[in-house]
C-alpha cells in the first residue's frame, strides 16, 4: 500500500481524506448513475448548496485567486446552476463528481495502477506541470498538487492524463481536498459516503484510508 503525507507548507491549510479502492468494475455509461445524476442536478437547481467559503479561503492562502482557478467542486456547481448537465465520463468518475458537487469539496480520483510509490500533497515547484485530461499542460508551480515518484499528477482543480480513471481501471485512489477547518467527524462521514456510493455503483471495496485527524 502506498504511503501518503502532507508537506509542512500545507499543514493547517488543507486537511485531505484519502481512500484506496480495489475490485472496481467501471463502465463508460451506467443507466443507474445517469438517472442518479439527473436527479442530483434537479435537486441542486431547486435547492442549491451554499458554496463553501472555506474552500475559496484554502486557495487564497496559497496565493491563488479562486475566481480564476476554480476548485473543481465550485466549477461543477456553476455548471449545474447554468442549466448544464454534470459531465458523464464513466461510472466511477460520475459518482466522484456527484459527491464533489453535493458536498462542495474538491475531489481527485486516480487510477492507482498508474500511481508510483508514496504520494505527497505539496506545493508545486517552478516549472512543474503535467498533461491534463483533454487539455494542454497543467502548470502547478505554487499550487497544491499531489506528487508520486514520477512527479505531480493531480490537484483540486484539474487532474492528469497519466492517472485518469477509465473503463480499464480496477484499483483507484480518491482524495478529498478539504480545508483545514473541516471537522474530522464531518470529513470521515464524507469519505464514508463517497466510498459507499462508489461501492454501490462499481462493486469496489475499500482496502485502506488516510485521514488527517
Regions found by a protein language model. Name each.
Residues 1-213:
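Charge-biased, low-complexity intrinsically disordered regions
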Amino acid at each position: 500500500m502506498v504511503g501518503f503525507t502532507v508537506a509542512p507548507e500545507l499543514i493547517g491549510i488543507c486537511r485531505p481524506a484519502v481512500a484506496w479502492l480495489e475490485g472496481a468494475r467501471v463502465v463508460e455509461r451506467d443507466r443507474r448513475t445517469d438517472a442518479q445524476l439527473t436527479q442530483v442536478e434537479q435537486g441542486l437547481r431547486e435547492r442549491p448548496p451554499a458554496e463553501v467559503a472555506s474552500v475559496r479561503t484554502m486557495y487564497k492562502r496559497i496565493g491563488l485567486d479562486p475566481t480564476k482557478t476554480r476548485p473543481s467542486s465550485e466549477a461543477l456547481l456553476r455548471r449545474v446552476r447554468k442549466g448544464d448537465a454534470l459531465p458523464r465520463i464513466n461510472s466511477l468518475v460520475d459518482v466522484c463528481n456527484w459527491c464533489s458537487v453535493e458536498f462542495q469539496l474538491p475531489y481527485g480520483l486516480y487510477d492507482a495502477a498508474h500511481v508510483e510509490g508514496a504520494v505527497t500533497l505539496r506545493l508545486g515547484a517552478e516549472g512543474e506541470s503535467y498533461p491534463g485530461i483533454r487539455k494542454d499542460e497543467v502548470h502547478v508551480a505554487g499550487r497544491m498538487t499531489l506528487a508520486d515518484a514520477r512527479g505531480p499528477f493531480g490537484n483540486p482543480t484539474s487532474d492528469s492524463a497519466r492517472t485518469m480513471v477509465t473503463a480499464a481501471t480496477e484499483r483507484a485512489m480518491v482524495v478529498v481536498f478539504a480545508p483545514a477547518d473541516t471537522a474530522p467527524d464531518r470529513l470521515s462521514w464524507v469519505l464514508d459516503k463517497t466510498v459507499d456510493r462508489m461501492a454501490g455503483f462499481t462493486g469496489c471495496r475499500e482496502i485502506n484510508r488516510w485521514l488527517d485527524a
